[in-house]
């Protein structure tokens, strides 16, 4: 069960169906002791391995919610192997449904807490395409701490202006907190609008550029 094949009762059914072998021998008794480090365990002829914790880097696409279940939309768990779903993985933090980029899925609650705890001030870097021209004055406002329209004060953040045209900007934003729709609201406070948002990093994790959207 700890290998992600299902619940204990589901594994018992697999054993009865003679679909599991240990060191080349069919096992039907769930009480048989095995050592996952030395014994070869096969399910339908494929080797399975015991992993206490699972870590999955995903390039989340738009249109998918960062949740374990949702009645209206496809979730990020719908994009991964069901085997990992059975191991209890969950998304670490949330990306808006129309935001894409780096998302970590794991069943390591301690790591998730370290990455998400406000006390840890883990830096996250986003790249945004903005309708409107972001200015050095906007960067200064970010550095001082943007005040949102509802009066919420944001921690000081870093705004790097990568390029601008007459009516559009490409920027990178470095945040150490994660308020609801924060990047969009901070840019809105400067009188501009985010039209595309991608997360590039989360602490030491950097999005693997070889991952296609949804991988």
Where are these regions (language model features)?
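Basic, flexible Lys/Arg- and Gly-enriched helix-loop patches that mediate nucleic-acid binding at interfaces
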Residues: 1-215
